[in-house]
Amino acid sequence: MSSDVLVTTPAQRQTEPHAEAVSRNRRQQATFRKVLAAAMATLREKSYADLTVRLVAARAKVAPATAYTYFSSKNHLIAEVYLDLVRQVPCVTDVNVPMPIRVTSSLRHLALVVADEPEIGAACTAALLDGGADPAVRAVRDRIGAEIHRRITSAIGPGADPGTVFALEMAFFGALVQAGSGTFTYHEIADRLGYVVGLILAGANEPSTGGSE
């Protein structure tokens, strides 16, 4: 008997388009990653001002139109580079480590993602600040904020106080702006963040003085 499939079952009809979609998504993801890697390599050689999506596309060996399919602008591309770096930072959740140390360690790791490549850090800061009017950049900023929020709440643990988390987020992003502008190095802000984290967490643990006398 021939092994050729002459009739496609309903299950096969449902599976085959799904398989095509999965394959297509994998190809798209591979292209996305390739352009991101090319952007990182280009930023090591070119300044923020000199980088263009076309230049990165040429390095990634993809058509400019393909690169623009994934990244609407230079700022969008660089913002995605920073988001990718943030996502590589592990969550610090070891319950055997005191909570303040977990939080400090988490923010320190996040602060140092571009510490050894200040030109990339400066480009990321410029893209995130200058691209505020770009909806694609705003969306990436929101995702970066969500990643930072998740790591802070994970480090604090169950029942993290929203006000404390917000204060830590504000301290972290303020520190990044100072490093990106060159006021401090990334290593310096990482050290200073440890002190600020201590103050915020100590204040959060102080008993409230409110209430009637």
Swiss-Prot record:
Region called Disordered, residue ranges: 1-26
GO biological process, one term: regulation of DNA-templated transcription
Keywords in alphabetical order: DNA-binding, Repeat, Transcription, Transcription regulation
PROSITE patterns named among the record's database cross-references: HTH_TETR_1, HTH_TETR_2
GO MF term set: DNA-binding transcription factor activity; transcription cis-regulatory region binding
Domain HTH tetR-type: 29-89
Biased composition (Polar residues): 1-14
Name of the protein in question: Uncharacterized HTH-type transcriptional regulator Rv0767c
